Amino acid sequence: MQNSLSVPPRDEGESNIPSGTIQSRKGLQNKSQFRTIAPKIVPKVLTSRMLPCHSPSHSDQVNLGPSINSKPLGMSTQNYALMQVAGQEGTFSLVALPHVASAQPIQKPRMSLPENLKLPIPRYQPPRNSKGSRKKPILIFPKSGCSKAPAQTQMCPQMSPSPPHHPELLYKPSPFEEVPSLEQAPASISTAALTNGSDHGDLRPPVTNTHGSLNPPATPASPTPEEPAKQDLTDLSGKAHFVSKITSSKPSAVVSEKFKEQVYLAKTMTSLSPAILGNAVQLISSVPKGKLPIPPYSRMKTTEVYKIKSDANIAGFSLPGPKADCDKISSTTEGFNAATKVASKLPVPQVSQQSACESAFCPPTKLDLNHKTKLNSGAAKRKGRKWKVPDEILAFQGKRRKCIINKCRDGKERVKNDPQEFRDQKLGTLKKYRSIMPKPIMVIPTLASLASPTIQSQMLGGLGQDVLLNNSLTPKYLGCKQDNSSSPKPSSVFRNGFSGIKKPWHRCHVCNHHFQFKQHLQDHMNTHTNRRPYSCRICRKSYVRPGSLSTHMKLHHGENRLKKLMCCEFCAKVFGHIRVYFGHLKEVHRVVISTEPAPSELQPGDIPKNRDVSVQGMEGSLERENKSNLEEDFLLNQAGEVKLQIKCGRCQITAQSFAEIKFHLLYVHGEEIQGRLQEGTFPGSKGTQEELVQHASHDWKRHPERGKPEKVHSSSEESHACPRLKRQLHLHQNGVEMPIENEGPQSGTNKPRETCQGPECPGLHTVLLWSRSGFNCLLCAEMLGQKEDLLHHWKHQHNCEDPSKLWAILNTVSNQGVIELSSEAEK
């Protein structure tokens, strides 16, 4: 049977297409060999899936390479693809269907041809990045479906010992649908291997499934139930084993083919050789069953099968990539083993990855790892390392805590790094963090950075899953970093809190306010006790805080502002503020000052004029405290027109000067006057009188009821207040009294007199003491040009002992040089 099987494929392989199917199977092996040398040939072989090749002898395999190179160019894939019907006979693969039957599959390979041609392009790119593919299994590991991964591991051992499972695999088309997904996405070699494993019983229907529904099976690959998934996984495992043989060594592949044919003959399956070269994957999976007992190959096969399955699952989600390439698979398996070893050596990243995989994915992934490690030589050690992982975590946490404590002591704050920033960091920045951060923290970003490019090279769906893995890994890693960065922050805040607590040394027991300085607390307590310890030495105004007093001194008593000290006419006290002076006069001496004109001087047109002038001047002064020189000059010019009205607070008698009120207080109320009447010391000067007029008018404006005319008192003392003052003044001056009496008629006749119109001033007349023309002598009718001449005249002509004192008295009594004298004094 072996010879018959081998001879007819040789004869009919050249003429008939079924032998081409047989040759295509071996061509795949040789193709894997040439693939390493010249990968561009792969797409051509895929297009001519059923190349005419003969028995699995070594010589045929050697000749397959050139035949494959020449025939796919000239031969049409339609004829070869149709020869899969030969498997339905079940007797011999050499018996092929007529060319009429091949016309049907011709259309199907047309659909697959452009796809196969496009597939090898991405296939060549990943083998260039062999390192990336080696890194790939680390992250691809969790990507595989939870249910599919254990199924793969379980089915692979079952395939080898049990031959009866082989027909079951051939009979089911569902794995067949998943296989084409690998045909499109993985590569041309994988598709050829898948097609070679066509069913013995039904070859055409699986062909229709493979070619007709290439795209649909890609999607159901993931959601298929467990049973079809297992079958598909078994088919894939068979393919993986077959591909691994090709990748391991060419002679091994040849031996495997011979062994496969023998196994099939023993199983009484005459059509095994053509079926293997058919489009179904199931028969190919049976061949690795025999090879599984070999320990070295079994390791590679299991890893490759697992990866092919993961690639198949990924193919249902993502774009076509380097999935079934022989070189690539071998590199990925080696990379997977190496990467797992490295990961086991690295404690922190391994723990984080495994924990992330456990949390993000199903536990079957763990089962796959356990099964895989059992097949591998270092399984026990890896398990031990896995159990040691918690210890490593504890050690790492202890180191991290120590670092945190040291950082807290140093008071250094570190900024939190986002996971994206972490991925985007360059090697230079990583080196910087190596010097700063602990080593385990450095390892995780490197693994993440290595894993991310491999997934990007494979597929977009893989990228999404890698993002999930990275996200699952990053929280723990970031948690470590956040602990490192956030832990010093509380320490710094704690210190700042201490510094903040130290600042409020003093607390107010009333309102619980804190103050840094004791003096501030004392000033604050004055607000609760209404105590004003800071008083102005000039105006006696008190304040709670020293700052208020300094402000007051700058505003009211500063050097830049001209201050006029006010001297009290009764007690000789000095006041810097006019209002304080007025308050003193009112409270102590019972004297009220205002600008209301006396009733004796009331005239129809004078009252509004004088009041308007005084009010205007007062309003201007109130609006601005720092008045300009123009306003001062205006007030100085208008001060002569405004007359002060000084009232006695006891008897309501008004006087126009302080001298009159002094005499009134002295002779009527018996109050002693402490001040001396000296020239230049009286408040009748222009500056002082100006301020008096200003503030008195303001005070009168605020109290308009004071502007009403006083009621006429019946007492003779009040009605004749002014004449009595004059009389007392003249009587007080003994030296002047006699000359007045003697020379009264002369002076009365020479000086103009004006009688006061009204009942209040009967018998009063005015005498001019001085005017623009000169100074008049009250004792005689003589007029002198200067004041010195008048004083000399009084001294020599009228024998006056102190003419300056007499001038001061007359000047105080007079109002703008006008002296009012009664008729009695004149007599």
Swiss-Prot record:
Keyword Transcription tagged: yes
Record Gene3D superfamilies: Classic Zinc Finger
Top-level division of the source organism's lineage: Eukaryota
One GO CC annotation: nucleus
Location of the protein in the cell: Nucleus
GO MF annotations, alphabetized: DNA-binding transcription factor activity; DNA-binding transcription factor activity, RNA polymerase II-specific; sequence-specific DNA binding; zinc ion binding
Provenance organism: Pongo abelii (Sumatran orangutan)
Name this protein carries in UniProt: Zinc finger protein 438
Chain positions covered by the region annotation Disordered: 1-31, 117-173, 193-232, 682-723
SUPFAM superfamilies to which the protein is assigned, alphabetical: beta-beta-alpha zinc fingers
Biased composition (Polar residues): 16-31, 150-159
Coiled coil: none
Bias-annotated ranges (Basic and acidic residues): 688-699, 706-721
Signal sequence, start to end: none
Keywords annotated in UniProt: DNA-binding, Metal-binding, Nucleus, Repeat, Repressor, Transcription, Transcription regulation, Zinc, Zinc-finger
ZnF region ranges: C2H2-type: 506-528, 534-556, 566-589, 775-798
Record field: compositional bias (Pro residues): 217-226
